[in-house]
Amino acid sequence: MSKIRVHEYAKKHNISSKDLMTKLKEMNIEVSNHMTMLDDEVVNKLDNEYQTEKPSVADEFEVEEKVVRSKKNSNKKKKKGKGNEDKRQENFAGRQQTQTVETPDKITFSGSLTVGDLAKKLSKEPSEIIKKLFMLGIMATINQDLDKDTIELIANDYGIEVEEEVIVSETEFETFIDEQDDEENLKERPAVVTIMGHVDHGKTTLLDSIRNSKVTAGEAGGITQHIGAYQVEVNDKKITFLDTPGHAAFTTMRARGAQVTDITILVVAADDGVMPQTVEAINHAKAAGVPIIVAVNKMDKPAANPDRVMQELTEYELVPEAWGGDTIFVPISAIQGEGIDNLLEMILLVSEVEEYKANPNRYATGTVIEAQLDKGKGTIATLLVQNGTLRVGDPIVVGTTFGRVRAMVSDIGRRVKVAGPSTPVEITGLNEVPQAGDRFMAFADEKKARQIGESRAQEALLAQRGEKSKLSLEDLFQQIQEGDVKEINLIVKADVQGSVEAMAASLRKIDVEGVKVKIIHTGVGAITESDIILASASNAIVIGFNVRPDVNAKRTAELENVDIRLHRIIYKVIEEIEAAMQGMLDPEFEEKVIGQAEVRQTFKVTKVGTIAGCYVTDGKITRDSGVRIIRDGVVIYEGQLDTLKRFKDDVKEVAQNYECGITIEKYNDLKEGDIIEAYIMEEVKR
């Protein structure tokens, strides 16, 4: 005979676990709790013990027969309908007694369970589960969801094992990625390098020096507006560079660059030192867990002080190798081209130490660096292949879009047929413009790729619809629900997706008390008539970044009086919107005490109330001021003046050292010695 637990034996013999444990103690058998295992010897002793106490079958039958007879006799005296109901209740009770439900050894669930569902799985009454939850301090109803910890707590109390089922999504790329690549299949790949740093410290100039080109002059305001990806060859080895904009407004783009990068080059100007965005770049690189190489730029300037840069960076745990640390510092002059070769050698050295590898013999996976809509070519996406090999003709799913790779162009504009790990390529053939930062995956079967792409698009659409319907409800009832809170609606259009994201992120960060920013629509490309119609319906301002409205959009905007703001520099946008938001705010007031008067005598007048004869001790009392009644240093009332008189004449104000008569609106409990403090509310300039 196998061992049995205390609670199982108790259930088998229709007794409570507590009574059984008491009985075992009487028999000098030690048990710690209801989960204790009972061996065969103890079970036999218990069987004998309960057998002696159990009534005989004949006795049970006799008792049962008497009960049945008595019930039958009593039923004769009742109405027929009532008797039938009692009989049904008896039969139901009988079935309940005879039906025994076994407690499961293990239950499974996914996500969460309601109290009712948990009771069903545990073969218990919901009321029993609710009672247990109450004892644990949890007030729950039968339809209330329980979290994983609570489910495990209740199940373990019954000695039942709990297992959570993980639902595998057919739209997640991880579902289709096989297990880790075997070491023998991994090959060396180029390092992906991101250049970061403060504005105007020379990030784009450094990249230009590496690529022997001058891009800086063509950018508006000296800002690198778009993320680009380039590949260079050094000593027969390749290095891939991601060019992330350095301004704080492009935090999202820079963070995305750090997620796909292997090495970060931190550019710090030797004459400026560490600046706010330098620290921000350090934090992004550290969060991504990538090695940092510090390029001390502008060494050709007379004010260059590399030692100060090193000293400042030690505060951020970037200690130079020369000072006993492990951070590589390379002095360079990007504009003169000095130190560039040394910097590239350091990148190759770090790559060699870190051993960056990937498996080229599989279908490609990677990240979207940039995406835009071209009139001639259609959707163009810049992809960084991170694992596997991408080939022309491969079915591909990119974010919520899908298609087949029609053509691939390298960073230097040449058509290529294959792209291995760490290679940036520009592809065409997608059905829609993906989001910058989206993951992509190539498939063997076009039908499967289409199915996954459509499913992902459907999921995104449902989520978007849910979000839109929620926002529209807030629009309808906003004034009722929020009252004084104002809101500014914006539509953001830009030339590329990266700029759209950066602009939206910057605008959402604007913090002006009392006003919210709501971006109701974003998009890539020219401002269209549909954008203007949406702006008109939503009372929104349209912001164009490096784009212009088409002819129809201009005409419609004039008819609908829609405000369109066009910019090429992001900071102009931020400043303009902040100003608009501050203008929309209700004026802010602060209190200013203008005078005090002491109550010298009081007079009670019928139909008027209490008149206080006062002496102005400080400042002045004005007719339109608010007042406080102060008695023994405690404010006992706050309200408005009703009348202010000198002798029998109404006056606008009474100055210091003059007497006056005062009545307070809706207040008559004035006493001699009270202090009347007068104040006004002044508008505060923002």
Curated annotation (Swiss-Prot):
Region of interest called G1, as start-end residue ranges on this chain: 197-204
Cellular compartment(s): Cytoplasm
Molecular function GO labels: GTP binding; GTPase activity; translation initiation factor activity
Disulfide bonds: none
A family per Pfam: GTP_EFTU
Residue ranges of the region described as Disordered: 53-105
SUPFAM superfamilies assigned to the protein according to its UniProt record, in alphabetical order: Initiation factor IF2/eIF5b, domain 3, P-loop containing nucleoside triphosphate hydrolases, Translation proteins
Region (G4): 297-300
Chain spans, region G2: 222-226
Occurrences of domain tr-type G (ranges): 188-357
Keyword Metal-binding found: no
Keyword S-adenosyl-L-methionine: no
Stretches the record annotates as G3: 243-246
CDD domains noted in UniProt: IF2_eIF5B, IF2_mtIF2_II, mtIF2_IVc
Top-level taxon of the source organism: Bacteria
Residue segments, region G5: 333-335
Basic residues compositional bias, start-end: 69-81
Role noted for this protein: One of the essential components for the initiation of protein synthesis. Protects formylmethionyl-tRNA from spontaneous hydrolysis and promotes its binding to the 30S ribosomal subunits. Also involved in the hydrolysis of GTP during the formation of the 70S ribosomal complex.
Annotated NCBIfam families: IF-2 (TIGR00487), small_GTP (TIGR00231)
Entry similarity comment: Belongs to the TRAFAC class translation factor GTPase superfamily. Classic translation factor GTPase family. IF-2 subfamily.
Protein name: Translation initiation factor IF-2
The organism of origin for this protein: Bacillus cereus (strain ATCC 10987 / NRS 248)
Gene, per the UniProt record: infB
